[in-house]
């Protein structure tokens, strides 16, 4: 085949050598990929679409022994006389060794000398995996090789049963929850139940999913004659439409609320322009490897991105800031990030764990890890430190902070926290007890020191719907009741709020809500006049914003930048609050009432925060240079390594230790002498219900990833803003249906799930199936692609993750023995760090999920 003409007229040209080996491929956009081969037909040089070379070397038995990336990173392998891998060298230079017994893999020894032992049965099914610390996991199979029992390291057993067609018909979880499944003659699941839920499915031609029904809540799916998804109908009967081109690519998307977006694509299928409502647009420019080089908005706002030879980001720039990244030559990990004039440096060990973070603003944070790779100590300079004691599974059982503060954690057999005790100076300053039910539902929480008991109720969709708090003779009840499509109400009869199509909150007892043509909240209008409020020019506001006031014309105004980030909030008193962001969407500044609050970031968490009056800006010595901003009274925030959980605050030479609950939500703060300075309790909306301390804003963090802005009554949640008053976001999910069909919602159960980025994840799918693809999700909310793996070769390998998809894919292909990813498949980053699975591309793309790439 030398020429391929696709349905859109795009032409792909292919050129072969004399041995019919594909040497050159030119895609419809003119980008060329070249491959050179040795005398055995093995690729030895691959030139990618950017003109960069990857080199591969083989031994005399034709085994791949070396892969060298365009940026000079290397992976290598050694083999025994039977051509089995006996060692591999990772990007960091560590050597992983393998031994075999009876023809199967027996031990894996990592670069730290930790030995993992594997035992297989006569059918080559894995029966036992023994970890370096002596713990083990077990699997049992029936005579047909089907898994019938899996036992975790704590002895918890999950049991499986099948019908004669090998369909899973029963799954019994360790907590007693029993799942039952029924299938039609084609092997499609039509009925699924457990101790809580019941779900029914219907199918069309060739097994395409037509509907999913739970408790009379029905979601439907429509297809074209090619069985390509064209429509999703939600529980209220609203439809989400897709218009496709000849290649099945989405070119028009019409949301549940009628909002329309059109996508222009180049010959390679890449989106080059998004035509948005209101004559707004966004254009994209790419390199040969599909990395975005330029993003331009309709108002002229531009973001620019630069990559190294391996396709890893090294520079990002917008009108507000220039970001520059220096990466480790071997691993590609970021070792220095420049954010304008501020610099953050990172040091790593050979396993990729961060061991030190420093900055030119004075941060010096050190981490150490135990033999199993778990965080063991953290230290800030010579002033503050924390240490961890863990059980043999790596779960925390005790944490000790500076000032003699000790946090002890008790857990049940599933690893869930059942009691947390905080002691300082030998006195218990906090004591919390938790009771859990099946499906990881938190049933109750007790503050043992105050006697306050809070009980929780859930519906059959895993929504947290009710909180009942009892203290003495007083009882307080808060409702969080969803309707058919997941819109939340604060009363059992669900009459206190009104919603529009697509989940827009239109009215509550106090306000009317107005939105722009992209679904962003632009005015929260008070129903009653406020004494401190400023009345806006009603006619002018209605004309400029395209709305019609329904009451007082007073309230909160919101303005949005062209890339969808909140730009300004005008308070009811008329004072504006303005925001600035870098090219990665991280908030770098807040301006309010003559004061600037600034942030410097360490990855996705803030490391420094400080404020100054605008009048304090000092001009540079050169008149043409912009004034230098003051950097005084800096607060350094310390987060538990690799998480969004704050652990310390360093300010004005003082150190404060932060205690968080099981979910990572801050609940207490102590000074360096062990005195409690801050104590906070949230309700099921994330609103503060009880507080002790001098200022609530002394610790502004709420749910993981959220920063409370007292000026706006909103929580900044990385890519969006969360309103604790409404229990949801004030703009749509920017990742669309990939975050679920509830585009304004926070997670279903905020007692068990978090949304660190403001991009709703898959917690609500835990224990269920994806509504579009039917892919099952485990109890932790991760997809199980076992039924959609590549069947003609290796489909599950371990690599050292680099943080770059293309580089990870190359490593996975090399490990699996492929010169390129098999057509129709893609590599999925499993939640287990470094594990890659070869999965059907279409299934992977349509199964909106959070995978290992986001986590690690």
PLM feature spans:
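A cytosolic small-molecule/anion-sensing beta-strand core signal
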Residues: 39, 517, 562, 583, ...
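A motif-centric feature for acidic-aromatic and gly/ser/thr-rich catalytic loops and repeats
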Residues: 434, 484, 494-500, 648-718, ...
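Cysteine-centered, disulfide-bonded loop motifs in secreted/extracellular proteins
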Residues: 519, 664-666, 682, 721-722, ...
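Short, low-complexity export/processing leader segments characterized by acidic and small residues
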Residues: 524, 668-669, 687-689, 720-730, ...
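Intrinsically disordered, low-complexity acidic Ser/Thr-rich regulatory segments
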Residues: 543-555, 624-632, 815-821
């Amino acid at each position: 085949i030398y020429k391929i003409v696709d349905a859109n007229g795009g032409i792909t040209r292919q050129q072969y050598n004399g041995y019919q080996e594909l040497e050159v491929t030119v895609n419809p956009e003119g980008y060329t990929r070249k491959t050179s081969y040795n005398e055995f037909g093995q690729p030895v040089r691959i030139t990618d679409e950017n003109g960069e070379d990857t080199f591969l070397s083989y031994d005399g038995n034709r085994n791949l022994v070396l892969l060298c990336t365009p940026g000079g990173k290397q992976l290598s392998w050694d083999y025994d006389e039977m051509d089995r891998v006996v060692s591999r060298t990772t990007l960091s230079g560590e050597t992983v060794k393998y031994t075999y017994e009876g023809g199967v893999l027996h031990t894996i020894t990592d670069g730290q000398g930790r030995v993992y032992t594997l035992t297989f049965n006569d059918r080559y099914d894995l029966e036992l995996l023994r970890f370096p610390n002596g713990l083990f996991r077990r699997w049992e199979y029936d005579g047909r090789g089907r898994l019938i029992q899996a036992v975790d390291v704590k002895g918890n057993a999950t049991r499986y049963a099948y019908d004669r067609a090998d369909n899973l018909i029963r799954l019994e979880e360790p907590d007693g929850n029993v799942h039952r499944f029924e299938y039609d003659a084609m092997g499609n699941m039509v009925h699924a139940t457990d101790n809580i839920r019941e779900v029914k499915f219907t199918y069309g031609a060739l097994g395409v999913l037509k509907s999913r029904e739970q408790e009379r809540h029905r979601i439907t799916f429509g297809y074209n004659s090619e069985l390509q998804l064209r429509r999703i109908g939600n529980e209220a009967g609203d439809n989400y439409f897709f218009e496709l081109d000849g290649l099945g690519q989405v070119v028009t998307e019409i949301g549940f609320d009628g909002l329309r977006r059109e996508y222009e694509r180049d010959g390679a299928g890449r989106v080059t322009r998004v035509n948005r409502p209101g004559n707004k647009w966004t254009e994209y420019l790419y390199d040969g490897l599909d990395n975005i080089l330029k993003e331009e908005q309709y108002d002229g706002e531009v973001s620019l991105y630069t990559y190294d030879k391996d396709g890893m980001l090294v520079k990002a720039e917008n009108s507000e800031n220039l970001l520059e990244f220096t990466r480790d030559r071997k691993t590609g990990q970021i070792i220095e990030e420049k954010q304008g004039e501020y610099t953050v440096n990172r040091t790593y060990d050979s396993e990729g764990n961060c061991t030190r973070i420093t900055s030119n603003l004075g941060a010096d944070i050190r981490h150490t890890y135990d033999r199993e790779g778990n965080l063991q100590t953290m230290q800030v300079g010579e002033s503050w430190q924390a240490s961890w004691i863990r059980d043999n599974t790596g779960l925390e059982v005790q944490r000790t902070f500076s000032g003699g503060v000790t946090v002890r954690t008790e857990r049940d057999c599933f690893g869930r926290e059942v009691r947390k005790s905080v002691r300082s100076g030998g006195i218990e300053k906090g004591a919390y007890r938790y009771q859990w039910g099946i499906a990881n539902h938190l049933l109750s929480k007790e503050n043992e020191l105050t006697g306050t008991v809070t009980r929780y109720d859930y519906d059959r969709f895993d929504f947290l719907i009710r909180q009942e708090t009892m203290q003495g003779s007083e009882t307080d009840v808060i409702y969080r009741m969803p309707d058919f499509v997941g819109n939340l109400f604060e009363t059992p009869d669900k009459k206190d709020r009104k919603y529009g199509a697509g989940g827009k909150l239109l009215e509550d007892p106090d306000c009317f809500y107005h939105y722009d043509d992209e679904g962003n909240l632009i005015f929260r209008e008070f129903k009653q006049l406020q004494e401190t409020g400023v009345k806006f020019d009603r006619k002018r506001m209605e004309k400029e914003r395209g709305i019609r006031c329904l009451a007082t014309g007073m309230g909160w105004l919101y303005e949005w930048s062209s890339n969808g980030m909140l730009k300004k909030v005008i308070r009811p008193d008329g004072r504006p609050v303005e925001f600035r962001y870098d090219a990665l969407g991280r908030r770098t500044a807040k301006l309010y009432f003559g004061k600037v609050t600034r942030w410097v970031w360490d990855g996705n968490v803030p490391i420094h925060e400080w404020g100054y009056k605008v009048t304090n800006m000092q001009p540079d010595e050169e008149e043409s240079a912009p004034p230098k901003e003051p950097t005084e009274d800096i607060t350094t925030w310390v987060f538990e390594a690799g998480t969004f959980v704050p652990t310390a605050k360093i300010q004005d030479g003082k150190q404060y230790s932060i205690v968080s609950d099981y979910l990572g939500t801050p609940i207490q703060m102590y000074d360096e002498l062990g005195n409690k300075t801050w104590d906070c309790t949230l309700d099921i909306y994330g609103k503060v219900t009880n507080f002790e301390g001098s200022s609530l804003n002394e610790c502004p963090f709420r749910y993981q990833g959220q920063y409370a802005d007292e000026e706006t009554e909103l929580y900044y949640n990385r890519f969006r803003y969360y309103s604790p008053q409404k229990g949801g976001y004030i703009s749509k999910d920017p990742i669309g249906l990939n975050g679920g069909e509830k585009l304004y919602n926070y997670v279903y159960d905020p007692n068990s799930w978090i949304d660190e980025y403001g991009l709703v994840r898959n917690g609500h799918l835990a224990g269920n199936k994806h509504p579009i693809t039917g892919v099952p999700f485990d109890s932790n909310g991760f997809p199980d692609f076992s039924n959609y793996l590549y069947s003609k070769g290796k489909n599950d390998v371990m690599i050292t993750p680099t943080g770059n998809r293309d580089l990870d894919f190359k490593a996975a292909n090399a490990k699996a023995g492929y010169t390129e990813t098999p057509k129709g498949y893609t590599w999925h980053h499993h939640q287990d760090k470094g594990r890659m699975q070869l999965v059907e591309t279409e299934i992977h793309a349509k199964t909106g999920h959070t995978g290992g790439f986001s986590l690690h």
